[in-house]
Amino acid sequence: MFEELDAEDGGEEQEMPMNVPEFGGGGEDIDDILGDAPDLPDDEYSNSVPQGAADGSIENDERRMRNDGAGSTNEDDEEPIEPTYLGDAIDSLMMHWCQLLTNVSVKAPVPPPSTLNHVKEVAEVCSKHFRDASVDVNNEFTRLGVQWEMEQPYSQYAIEEENLDEAIERQETIIAAAREMLNSRIQIYNEAHPNAGKHFTT
């Protein structure tokens, strides 16, 4: 087969011409070669480059780094808040609330208890602790309110003067309700004992 091909071609190899562009030859310029390339519109170029990226970006980064360092230094220099009875009461309340949810709630991987007595005992203990913690927080708020009224009497007087009309109206409503209750009780007693107070013994 190869012999037949050689016989047909006359034993000579034919070279195929290849057109390879030669850059830089013939006096051609690179601008002439790239002249047909599409240009990027000015609007797209302006939108693709963020404003302020060409100038001042390095200064902004340095200023941001300095501000972050100053903020972290100020946070480190701040003194911790002194512990108070109110803070301790709130921490205790949150702790017992989380304990109540953790001990009472049951998730899928955790097997349920074999008896309900265990759940009942745990719920009673956790609810009692949570109730005591709530009472402690309420008492602490009440104590702080009374302490503020004693230490700042003039501020308390100003607040009372602002709400004086409402306080008077509230007291009048309470007195009217008490009068109606007394009259109703007297009427019930007179109906039950019609001869009460009419016979005198000597």
Swiss-Prot record:
UniProt KW keywords: Coiled coil, Cytoplasm, Nucleus
Where's it mainly located? nucleus
Summarize what gene deletion causes. Answer: Viable, but sterile with defective development that is prominent during the late larval stages of development. The developmental defects include a squat body stature referred to as a dumpy phenotype, irregular gut, defective gonadal growth, with incomplete gonad development in some animals, a protruding vulva phenotype, defective uterus and spermatheca formation, and excretory canal defects.
Gene Ontology CC annotations of this record: cytoplasm; nucleus
Which lineage?
A: Eukaryota, Metazoa, Ecdysozoa, Nematoda, Chromadorea
Q: In which tissues is it expressed?
A: Ubiquitously expressed in tissues including epidermal, intestinal, pharyngeal and uterine, and is also expressed in vulval muscle cells and gut granules.
Recorded source organism is Caenorhabditis elegans
The record describes its quaternary structure and partners as: Interacts with mdt-6 and mdt-30.
Q: Does the keyword Cytoplasm apply?
A: yes
* Top-level division of the source organism's lineage: Eukaryota
Compartmental location: Nucleus; Cytoplasm
Q: What is this protein called?
A: Coiled-coil domain-containing protein mdt-28
Which chain positions lie within coiled-coil regions?
159-184
Function, as annotated, reads: Plays a role in normal growth and development.
Q: Return the Acidic residues bias intervals.
A: 1-15, 28-45
Q: Where is this region: Disordered?
A: 1-83
Establish whether keyword Transmembrane is in the entry.
Answer: no
